[in-house]
């Protein structure tokens, strides 16, 4: 399994647990880092930190493009797959959009319901198609474009 694929899964594990426990993802990340048998990949840390920093904005984007669905109505795993992928689409420039979508759909296929993969694909395709109009603030420490 490629390194970034593993990192996405580890990041999803942290985000999922934080969501279920209504906890701060950064605290869950610190806990995972402290008790992990294998180190938490740097890319997983970057993803969790990015989602945590932009969560309100990401959730607004999900609600905008998940027509007919509220965040609370979505399965927890789907909601966090979308958070992870939208962060990558809007703030991680070195990963091609097609890879982000494919990885998110694969996570949904592997970890969620039969309906989840098409749902995740549809929401992310809509975000990607409207990327120019979706406002994404720059990562911390970087100037706006």
From Swiss-Prot:
One of its GO terms (molecular function) is RNA binding. This is Transcription antitermination protein NusB. One of its GO terms (cellular component) is cytosol. Belongs to the NusB family. It holds the Pfam family NusB. Involved in transcription antitermination. Required for transcription of ribosomal RNA (rRNA) genes. Binds specifically to the boxA antiterminator sequence of the ribosomal RNA (rrn) operons. Keywords: RNA-binding, Transcription, Transcription antitermination, Transcription regulation. It comes from the Bacteria. The keyword Transcription applies. The keyword Secreted does not apply. The gene is nusB. HAMAP family: NusB. One of its GO terms (biological process) is DNA-templated transcription termination. Gene3D superfamilies: NusB-like (1.10.940.10). It comes from Acidothermus cellulolyticus (strain ATCC 43068 / DSM 8971 / 11B).
């Amino acid at each position: 399994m490629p390194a970034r694929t593993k990192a996405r899964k580890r990041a999803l594990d942290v985000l999922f647990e934080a969501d279920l426990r209504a906890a701060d993802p950064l605290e869950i990340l610190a806990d995972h880092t402290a008790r992990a048998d294998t180190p938490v990949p740097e890319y997983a840390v970057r993803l969790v930190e990015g989602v945590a920093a932009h969560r309100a904005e990401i959730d607004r984007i999900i609600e905008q493009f998940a027509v007919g669905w509220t965040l609370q109505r979505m399965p927890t795993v789907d909601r966090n797959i979308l958070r992870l992928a939208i962060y990558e689409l809007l703030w991680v420039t070195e990963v091609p959009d097609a890879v982000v979508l494919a990885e998110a759909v694969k996570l949904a296929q592997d970890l969620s319901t039969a309906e989840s993969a098409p749902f995740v694909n549809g929401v992310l395709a809509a975000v990607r198609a409207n990327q120019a109009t979706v406002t994404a603030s720059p990562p911390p420490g970087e100037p706006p474009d």
